[in-house]
Amino acid sequence: MYRRDFLDAHGIRFLETPGASYQDASFAFKVLAAAERAVFLSEPIVDYRQDNASSSVKSRGKAFAVCDEYAEMLRWVDASGMDDECKGILTRAALRAKYDSYMWNYVRIAPELRAPFLERMADEYRESISSGTFSLEDLAPWKRVNLREIMRDLHASYADAGRLGRAGHYLRLGGPSVLAAYLRSRR
């Protein structure tokens, strides 16, 4: 639950998207970035539905809506009036979260949407890196080698689903040290 005056004071609104696709992403980011304090509950109060017949991951228009959510996060940070240091921290945090969201989306979208989705992902990260708002070093080692490979060759194989498929992929891309970092993160 949110106080309306808090949302209004910080210009926090849901981004309008087809079928409310991914709307929670930028809303939650903005709320957490603007909040001075928060209370979290351990019991679930939302029933999160995914992968139904008209799911975001099955529609070309909706599959790319996640990209609009991350663009909205960056727009909001830029317009926030925060000092440059705070903007930099929040921008990097959004771009780290974006990697995870994009990869989550990638494995769920229809196969025919995967190549165009990775192309957009690669273009967005190339721009962020060239503008200096993001560095591959901001990512964990296995994510870093994976994103580097996506930007290098969109058609290179991505990790097979499941822990073993990803482990083999990270070993191939980054060697034993990257595999070890990935496995340590999964404990």
Predicted regions and their residues:
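Solvent-exposed aromatic/hydrophobic patches embedded in short alpha-helical segments
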Residues: M1-Y2, K30-V31, A94-Y102
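Charge-rich, low-complexity amphipathic helices
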Residues: D24, F29-K30, A53-V57, Y70, ...
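All-alpha amphipathic helical-bundle segments outside canonical DNA-binding/catalytic cores
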Residues: D84-A93
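Residue-level signal for alpha-helical context at structural boundaries
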Residues: A25, R49, T91-R92, L139
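Gram-positive cell-envelope targeting signals
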Residues: I12, A35, F40, S55-S56, ...
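Catalytic core of nucleotide-sugar-dependent glycosyltransferases
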Residues: E43-D51, V57-D84, K98-S131
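Conserved nucleotide-sugar donor-binding catalytic segment
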Residues: M1-G61
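Membrane-interface aromatic/basic loop that binds lipid-linked glycans or pyrophosphate carriers
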Residues: V107-R187
